[in-house]
Amino acid sequence: MGKGNEDSDLHCSSIQCSTDQPPFQQISFTEKGSDEKKPFKEKGKTAFSHSSEKHIQRQGSEPNPNKENSEETKLKAGNSTAGSEPESSSYRENCRKRKMSSKDSCQDTAGNCPEKECSLSLNKKSRSSTAVHNSEIQETCDAHHRGHSRACTGHSKRHRSRALGVQTPSIRKSLVTSVRAMSEAVYQDLAQVWAQQIHSPLTCEQLTLLTRLRGPLCAQVQTLYSMATQAAYVFPAESWLVPATLPGPGESALDREAHPFPGQEITETVSGSDEAKL
């Protein structure tokens, strides 16, 4: 029995050394003899020590593939994380840039629309204002040209009328004749009133009123008549412009009771009572 156990222990130790497996725990067999336990323990210790030394040497000489694989995976993971971080940051920056560019484009489109409308409206207003200004300038030029042409035609007509001896316009003739007719009518009325005083004497009140009216009326008549005569004599003298009768210098037509107006004569003399009243 003892020899069989020893052979089995040696066989196990040889198997452990050949397979390079980790050392197993010490197996103790309880047998009757104490002498047989001691050589078994000593042999087991020596075999275990030899196998452990060999295993440690092999572990030191040969690299562990699992550790290398784990280190490689860690390095790859670190590299992947280090590469992914800048990639993710660049991706985020690109996204931000795209968002900012889209916002800017939207703002530009939203802001350019009213600017374009304003520019179009300003262009339209400027065009309309320039068109109006050009039309006004054209109108003024046309009016100036027309006035110049009319002035030229007027000068030419005047020269022609003077050269051919044509009569003056009808407006001047009617103006002069109307002024002369009015002055003569007022003069006739005053002469008739003064003549009626002889046949039917007037009262004191009527005479005072007549004397008050006589001064301004005579002055107006004289001015009108003188204006008519001046207008007649300023222009070239013609038959219709020459007045019929002119008052003498230094005397008025109303002061001459004997000759108040051409065609009218006062034959009756003033009585003494009337003279006293006057």
Swiss-Prot record:
The species this protein belongs to is Homo sapiens
Which UniProt keywords are present, listed alphabetically? Nucleus
Domain of life where this protein originates: Eukaryota
Subcellular localization, per the record? Nucleus
Stretches the record annotates as Disordered = 1-129, 251-278
Q: Give the signal sequence positions.
A: none
Question: What is the protein name for this chain?
Answer: Protein FRG2
**What does the tissue specificity note say?**
Expression is undetectable in all tissues tested except for differentiating myoblasts of FSHD patients, which display low, yet distinct levels of expression, partly from FRG2, but predominantly originating from its homolog on chromosome 10.
Which cellular components does GO assign to this protein?
nucleus
Any one Pfam family here would be FRG2
Tell me its family. Belongs to the FRG2 family.
Q: Where is the composition biased (Basic and acidic residues)?
A: 1-10, 32-56
KW RNA-binding (keyword) present = no
InterPro entries referenced in this protein's UniProt entry, alphabetically: FRG2 (IPR026245)
Compositionally biased tracts (Polar residues):
11-31, 78-92, 120-129
